[in-house]
Structure formats: C-alpha cells, structure tokens
Amino acid sequence: MHLLFALAVAALPSVLRMDDALRIFREGGFDLLIADAQVAAAQGDAAAAGAIANPQLSGSAGRSFGYDATACPGCSATAWSVGLTDPGALSDLLTGKRGLRLDVARAAVAAARLSRDDALRALSLQVRQALLDGALQQAQLDLAREIAESTDQTRALNQRRMQAGAISEAELARAEVAALEAQQGVDLAEQAVRAGRLQIAFLLGSREPAADFTVDPSLLDRPMPAEAPPLDALAREALERRPDLLAASAQESRAEAGLSLARRQRVPDVALSAQYQEEGSGQNALQPPTVTFGIQVPVPLFYQQQGEIGRAQAEIRAQRATVEKLRAQALVDVQSARAAVDANRRLVDRMRARLLERARRTRDLVQIQYEKGAASLLELLDAQRVWAQTRAEYLKDLHDFWLAVFQLDAAVGRS
C-alpha cells in the first residue's frame, strides 16, 4: 500500500455499517499504519543482515628527498602503492555467518508480519466494539426521547387537569419534575452519541474526526447467530490461527537462529589483503615493484562469545515461556468469550420471550388507567420507570451479546 494512499482521508458514509467501518480501518487506521511501518523496518533489517561487506581500496604516494634518481636507470624518487582489502566478506560467506544472520532477520520479518496481523485482530475488535457502543448510545438516545415525550404528554395532561381543578399543584409539580429529568436524560444521551461517533471516526483514521454520520441501528437488534461450535473445536482453531501465538513461535525461531549465529561467531573473521607498491623499477630502485598478500585473523584467546551465547540461550527460554503463556491465554480467552456468549444469549432470549413485552404492556395499561383517572401519578411514573429500565437492560444485553460474539471471534484469531 502506498503511503500517500494510506494517508488519504476516507470519507465516512452517512450510515456506517460494520463492513464499511472495517474496510475503512484497514485502509487507513492509525495503529495499522504504524504496524505496517514496523514490518517495513524489519524488512530493512533483513536487507542489512544480508549485505556483503564492500572491499576497501587504498592508495598512497610519496617522494624521497636527498636521493638522486638520475644516478641509475629506472630509479625514481617517487613512491606509490595501491592496495585492496577484503574486510571479511569472503570469510562471512564461507563460515555461514551471513546465512545465519539472514535466518535471524527472516524470522524477525515473519514475526513482524504476524504481529501486524495480531494488531489487526485486536484493533478490529476495538472498531467493532466502538460501533456497538455507538449503536447502543443511539438506541439509548431514542429511548430517552421516547421517555421525554411520554413524560411531557403526562405533564401537559396534568396541566389541563389542574386548570380544571381536578388535581393539586403538587401533582403537577411531580409531573413537571419527571418531564425535566427526562429532558436531562436526552441531553446526556445526545452528548454520549456525539462522543462515541468522534471516537469511531478517530479509530477509522479520520484526520479531522467529525460526528456527521449514523451508526447502522441494525447492529444491535437483529437475529442472533446459531450456536457456536463446541469448545474443543474453538480451542483448536485458536491454537492454530491466533496471530499472537504464531508471532511468538516466530520469535522463538528467531531466538534459536540467534543462538546458532552467536555460536558461529566464535569462528574468527579472516581479513585478506593484496598490495602493490614501487619506488622506481630498476635494480637499484629504492623499492622495486612488489606485490604483497596479507591475512589478518583475530586470536580468540581470552573471549569466545560466552556473553552473546548466554544471552541467546536466555532469550530462547524467554520466548518458549512466552509461547506457553500465550497458549494458556488463548484457551482462557476462548472459554471466557464462549461463556459470555451463552450467558448473554439466555438474557436476550428471556427479554424477547416475555419480560420486555410485559413491561411495555404494563406501562401502556397504567397509562390508559391514569388518563381515565383510575391510577395515580406515582403508579404511572413507576410503570414508566420499570419500562425504561427494562428496555435499557434489554439494549445492554444485546450490546453485551454481540460484543461477546466479536470477542469470541478475536479469541480464535478471526479479524
């Protein structure tokens, strides 16, 4: 993905659906762009690890004083030399150190790519949760407006009754307080909706976040999916495809390659050189044409890479422990998410089966009774409170159910 394309501001649709949000996030989410840059950095490290050291070319020139170069044929007072040195490239290839460095770097690239996939998994869950929160906040705003409208109608009815002398001012005051409190709830719900939309826009990579869109309301109240597969099947899927676990395995491979490289570093690097020099060319020249070959080998007399080897061995142990920790964490995540899905499914089913309908029916009946004078204002307010509480609880149960579904997807490695 070209950087300019990735940085382009994605226009949010007027009604933001889940698929659209995930697509926009994958194209330009801030954290995903950072993860892409980390992969590119690892690829750069791999290119550097495979680099072959450049040979070194040297040359020098000088002049001898107090020497008569004309006294003999071929003599010269000018000295010059040229040399070529291999700082260890040939030795690097023959000893296999370059190949081992490449193994380490390639494993690091694989780990970076898998870490990017894991970032996509975790961040996709954040996007889904943010959209669920936005849908819940919109539904709560609709509920708050419904309550405000109902309480305002009750206030207006009581206003007419008091003018007719049918009720006292105290009862009207109660109705007015209920209406004002309901309007307070509307204002708070509107603020929550706006804040939630701004957070969604930020997560999706908007450079100038705005709240001029609506979250798809069907994200909450829609048919529930079929029962999840058995727990053992979900656990196997998580262990096979979770990118954080695969990335940890790649890091373990990188650590093992690093240990092999540390051990191979005990083989001394050999530097080769060749030099040609002359100061004159005759038999009496100060320095007749001379070719010199050299070799330089460090003698590992006092230090044989013990520190690097010990560090590499410790890193292998740490990476293996990390793999085991992530395996256990993956199984915990799967079991917790599956339990949450099942529990919230039962709550939603119970709400849909009877509880929600009975709370609404009770509110409607008491409303009719109050309008006919057969119920008190306190009974009406209590019925409205129970209905609002039940409806709000139902919306929260729906939110928690779908969040648990998305968490289960993330737990098994789906993004």
For the regions a protein language model found, what residue spans apply to each?
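Sec-dependent N-terminal signal peptides
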Residues: 2-10
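Cleaved targeting-peptide boundary
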Residues: 10-19
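A glycine-/polar-enriched beta->alpha junction
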Residues: 23-33, 40-55, 68, 83-104, ...
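Periplasmic alpha-helical coiled-coil/stalk elements that build and connect Gram-negative outer-membrane
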Residues: 16, 116-237, 340, 344, ...
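Amphipathic alpha-helical coiled-coil segments
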Residues: 34-49, 119, 123-145, 153-156, ...
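Amphipathic alpha-helical coiled-coil scaffold segments and their short linker/junction regions
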Residues: 19-28, 82, 91, 167, ...
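Short, charged, amphipathic alpha-helical segments
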Residues: 106, 169-178, 377-385
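Small/polar, glycine/serine/threonine/aspartate-rich low-complexity segments that form flexible
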Residues: 12, 58-101, 217-228, 260, ...
